[in-house]
Amino acid sequence: MVHEYDNTLKVCLVRSLIGVPSRHRLSVRALGLRKVSDMRKVNDTPQVRGLIKKVHYLVRIQD
């Protein structure tokens, strides 16, 4: 079942992953971010919001 979401968020990695717990690294990777200043458009779903909440200190969100 495929859902189309009108709401998307732009997520940008603003801090390095050096010294960050491995679970937080995995969350950043799940958002599709690899390097500092990488930006990715993601669907605005509860699952994505949870990932962003977990790593809020590493990313910047733009609507």
Curated annotation (Swiss-Prot):
<dbReference type="InterPro" id="IPR036919">
    <property type="entry name" value="Ribo_uL30_ferredoxin-like_sf"/>
</dbReference>
<dbReference type="GO" id="GO:0003735">
    <property type="term" value="F:structural constituent of ribosome"/>
</dbReference>
<keyword id="KW-0689">Ribosomal protein</keyword>
<comment type="similarity">
    <text>Belongs to the universal ribosomal protein uL30 family.</text>
</comment>
<dbReference type="InterPro" id="IPR005996">
    <property type="entry name" value="Ribosomal_uL30_bac-type"/>
</dbReference>
<protein>
    <recommendedName>
        <fullName>Large ribosomal subunit protein uL30</fullName>
    </recommendedName>
</protein>
<dbReference type="Pfam" id="PF00327">
    <property type="entry name" value="Ribosomal_L30"/>
</dbReference>
<comment type="subunit">
    <text>Part of the 50S ribosomal subunit.</text>
</comment>
<dbReference type="InterPro" id="IPR016082">
    <property type="entry name" value="Ribosomal_uL30_ferredoxin-like"/>
</dbReference>
<dbReference type="GO" id="GO:0022625">
    <property type="term" value="C:cytosolic large ribosomal subunit"/>
</dbReference>
<keyword id="KW-0687">Ribonucleoprotein</keyword>
<dbReference type="GO" id="GO:0006412">
    <property type="term" value="P:translation"/>
</dbReference>
